[in-house]
Curated annotation (Swiss-Prot):
Residues 1-35 form the signal peptide. The keyword Mitochondrion does not apply. Hydrolyzes 6-sulfate groups in N-acetyl-d-glucosaminide units of heparin sulfate and keratan sulfate. Belongs to the sulfatase family. Glycans are attached at residues 103, 109, 175, 190, 202, 271, 354, 379, 397, 414, 441, 472. The conversion to 3-oxoalanine (also known as C-formylglycine, FGly), of a serine or cysteine residue in prokaryotes and of a cysteine residue in eukaryotes, is critical for catalytic activity. Binds 1 Ca(2+) ion per subunit. PANTHER family: N-ACETYLGLUCOSAMINE-6-SULFATASE, N-ACETYLGLUCOSAMINE-6-SULFATASE FAMILY MEMBER. Its main location: other. The active site is at residue 83. It holds the Pfam family Sulfatase. It comes from Mus musculus. This is N-acetylglucosamine-6-sulfatase.
């Protein structure tokens, strides 16, 4: 039975971009239409999978089939440590200040009508389909508010997808609803037919069986794992019984020299809190075993059909995660390595096996890379990211960036939580013991610098303290000591300047390796005044 297409009764019929929207894109791939053996692309995206705390450990088959067959990036970051802003960055190739998705709510532009009108027509899948002639397939979690009645419901199919099997709202494993090319299909709690990771695997295998062989394809498969509620498949629910969350140097300690939200965490954590996060850690790993199976099934199918050697496979996550670091129980959202660093593994034609790249990359680079593979002229986009293709192909004369931007706008309202009256107003994502993971003014921007000379992180907060955090990651990989008050003021000024440049960049100016303005003079007093910097005010009040 042929899979139904998102285009309607005629399978494979492309949904065209509106003519006016298509005009700026024309010319990119047209020269490649009809070219032999254009590569296929498979993008596998997990939900909340860290790189710092052993997130790849359970995925032995994935590491063997993708990482060992290609390249593993050891310095891959997300521009925002939260699902919807990060996923929007993958799709658009833009930093959050340019796509304006700031959190997981409709009000924060997550799958809102504004997002659908302004950003979706220019995502890289839209270009792949309407300009480059690719068959495009999506299955799994899209954006956290996808399917909301106020934003088109499940009938909405974003431009750019030939086959659309999207999850309503946030990650679940059972009792969910899928949009099957715009029509709702409910699932229950029968493992054999409803377990979402396996459902996504089966939909993907069906697509590979029934797709057209005359056009290249792009597949994006977005699993619920290892996001809460961490429901493992029955056969894996006893796995990792002796595993606990890593007790690294920043586990269960007080964030003494950090911004106020981290300082409010209670140290030491209670025994019940530690038992809870250890259980969560184990269950997260258990859910990833089904992802490992999914990867194996897809690679085997591509191999059996003779398409593996012409297919690029990307494996990554939308953000990292923490389990007890600085006494924060479990979540993401924070600026530290455990939340912003993610796995990134790539295999494909021309990529030598068993490589590790230390180059500084971001998920805004995925879209430009995939368009580059398809032959599209990246100069015709307004994407902020850079193509990874020169790195993947081993270009020895490559000039690359030394800085990437991380930015986040806190969730919550400036009111007191009645269940935690002793805390400051505006906290959110609070646990029963009133340890909170977010707040309305947990708004920050960071520049992550990695070069032959420096391995630093510099962050500014838009709060009453106008707090600054700086870390030497080489000397302090667990980010225990904030050196903002002791670092050389000249270096501090350079980092501040780099941050301002990145927060004001757009398109080509984001892709230019950082060069300092020799005329720039830094005034330390401006950083710690009570009014906030021009940069932070602009970010927090940027219109959607």
């Amino acid at each position: 039975m042929r899979l139904p297409s998102a285009a309607g009764p005629r399978p494979g019929r492309p949904r065209r971009l509106p003519a006016l929207l298509l005009l700026p894109l024309l010319g990119g791939c047209l020269g490649l239409v009809g070219a032999a053996r254009r590569p296929n692309v498979l993008l596998l995206l997990t939900d909340d999978q860290d790189a710092e705390l052993g997130g790849m450990t359970p995925l032995k088959k994935t590491k063997a089939l993708i990482g060992e067959k290609g390249m593993t990036f050891s310095s891959a970051y997300v521009p925002s440590a939260l699902c919807c802003p990060s996923r929007a960055s993958i799709l658009t190739g833009k930093y959050p200040h340019n796509h304006h998705v700031v959190n997981n709510t409709l009000e924060g532009n997550c799958s809102s009508k504004a997002w659908q009108k302004i950003q979706e027509p220019y995502t890289f899948p839209a270009i792949l389909k309407s300009v480059c002639g690719y068959q495009t397939f999506f299955a799994g979690k899209y954006l956290n508010e996808y399917g909301a009645p106020d934003a088109g419901g499940l009938e909405h199919i974003p431009l750019g997808w030939s086959y659309w099997y999207a999850l309503e709202k946030n990650s679940k494993y059972y009792n969910y609803t899928l949009s099957i090319n715009g029509k709702a299909r409910k699932h229950g709690e029968n493992y054999s037919v409803d377990y979402l990771t396996d459902v996504l695997a089966n939909l993907s295998l069906d697509f590979l069986d029934y797709k057209s062989n005359s056009e290249p394809f792009f597949m994006m498969i977005s699993t619920p794992a290892p996001h809460s509620p961490w429901t493992a498949a029955p056969q894996y629910q006893k796995a990792f019984q002796n595993v606990i969350a890593p007790r690294n140097k920043n586990f269960n300690i007080h964030g003494t020299n950090k911004h106020w939200l981290i300082r409010q965490a209670k140290t030491p954590m209670t025994n019940s809190s530690i038992r809870f996060l250890d259980d969560a850690f184990r269950r997260r790993w258990q859910t990833l075993l089904s992802v490992d199976d999914l990867v194996e099934k897809l690679v085997k199918r591509l191999d059996s059909t003779g398409e593996l050697d012409n297919t690029y496979i990307f494996y990554t996550s939308d953000n990292g995660y923490h389990t007890g670091q600085f006494s924060l129980p479990i979540d993401k959202r924070q600026l530290y390595e455990f939340d912003i660093k993610v796995p990134l593994l790539v295999r494909g034609p021309g990529i030598k096996p068993n490589q590790t790249s230390k180059m500084l990359v971001s998920n805004i680079d995925l879209g430009p890379t995939i368009l580059d593979l398809a032959g599209y002229d990246l100069n015709k986009t307004q994407m902020d990211g850079m193509s990874l293709l020169p790195i993947l192909k081993g270009d020895r004369n490559l000039t690359w960036r030394s800085d990437v931007l991380v930015e986040y706008q806190g969730e919550g309202r400036n009111v007191t939580d009645p269940t935690c009256p002793s805390l400051s107003p505006g906290v959110s994502q609070c646990f029963p013991d009133c340890v909170c993971e977010d707040a309305y003014n947990n708004t920050y921007a960071c520049v992550r610098t990695l070069s032959s000379l420096w391995n630093l992180q510099y962050c500014e907060f838009d709060d009453q303290e106008v707090f600054v955090e700086v870390y030497n990651i080489t000397a302090d990989p667990d980010q225990i000591t904030n050196i903002a008050k002791s670092i050389d003021p000249e270096l501090l000024g350079k980092m501040n300047y780099r941050l301002m440049m990145l927060q004001s960049c757009s398109g080509p100016t984001c892709r230019t390796p950082g060069v300092f303005d020799p005329g720039y003079r830094f005034d330390l007093r401006l950083m710690f005044n009570s009014h906030g910097s021009v940069r932070t005010r602009r970010f927090s009040k940027h219109p959607l």
